[in-house]
Amino acid sequence: MIFLISGGFFVMRQLFRQSILSSANELNHTGGISEVREVLLGDMLQYIAIEGENMDNPVCLFLHGGPGLSLPYGISSRHQLETISSHCTVVYWDQRGAGKTYSTNPSDVSFTYEQVEADAKELITYLRREFEVDQIYLIGYSWGSVLGMRLVHEIPEQLYAYFGLSQVVHPLQSEQVLYDWLLDEFESTGHHQLVSSLKQLGQPPYEQASSQETFQQILNQSNAYVKWREGLPNVNVLNWIRQVLACPDLTLKEAYDTLIGASHQTLKQSQYWSQLQAVNLLEEIKEVKIPVYFATGVDDYICSVSLLQSWVEQLQAPKKEVLILDNSAHYFSNEDESIIYQWMKDLIAKKFPQAEEAPDETTVGEIFSNLLQ
């Protein structure tokens, strides 16, 4: 039985990989691009995936979350976001300490935020030179949104606009709200052992990595990440796992590191986590020079929605919008993901109408839950 299951797994994995490579070959032969590159950023060889139907389209760089977790929006996302890649040349990056980059450099996890930011600036310079453009779009997800907003603040002349997905604003404040919510959640559902564990751990902040890891383990047993519908999670986590296991650019060891190994080691050994815990965009960034757009789940208890709204209300920007998704928590539901990608595509099309397609029946205005001018 074990041999049958193992054999079936490898057959399915090979079929998925062949499908992705076939689509990549088609793009590469019809004026587009789909490939993985090794680039030297800082002192380290790192990995990016580039995909798009037309290389004349604007460049969009994704900054994944974690820290140390390149899912979603690392190189395993190749062939996954066709709504975006039809309109942009999309770049996915496995950052220092994450995914394939971690697998190639497993001993180098004692890095700092400053190193990751320097890597990002080098990568943006590389992309601008490679595609002969002055500016690119930047898309930050979860912890990657801290890096994204700081880049917006520091190098606005190199960016068209910024999209913050599940935007981090003030981790300490969000974590304190999250702690209280977890207590209420576990008490109301009768999980008394988890209530006891939380109280024993105490309220954040957690200075020790071991305490933060314990809090994360407790958090993983809650509904803070995912909104549930009719007793089922409203996020296809299995699809994310399949995406990594089927990725033709990852060995099985690299797939394991992408899903588990890299984030675990990064949390234990790098300074990155403690540095991110000290972020306070409320005080740090009060004005930006480019348009900024944010999308968040209405039930995101990891990154406080009310905190995001308060910050954006005060933020000075040429244009700013907040899209609140009714069917999502920190992770976006399948239907809300589709809304986000169409929203991003429509906003980019306003600046690059040459790539615009026939409009959908649903307009951007109809899907905005909240609009801030």
Positions of PLM-derived features:
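Conserved acidic catalytic loop of the alpha/beta-hydrolase fold
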Residues: 115-135
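Alpha/beta-hydrolase
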Residues: 192-283, 290
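Short beta-strand/loop motif that positions the catalytic acidic residue
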Residues: 288, 294-296, 300
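Conserved hydrolase catalytic core segment
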Residues: 134-176
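Catalytic histidine-centered segment of alpha/beta-hydrolase-like enzymes
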Residues: 328-337, 341
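The serine-hydrolase catalytic nucleophile loop
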Residues: 70-80
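A catalytic-pocket lid/entrance helix-loop region that shapes and gates access to the active site
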Residues: 159-206
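Conserved alpha/beta-hydrolase
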Residues: 84-102
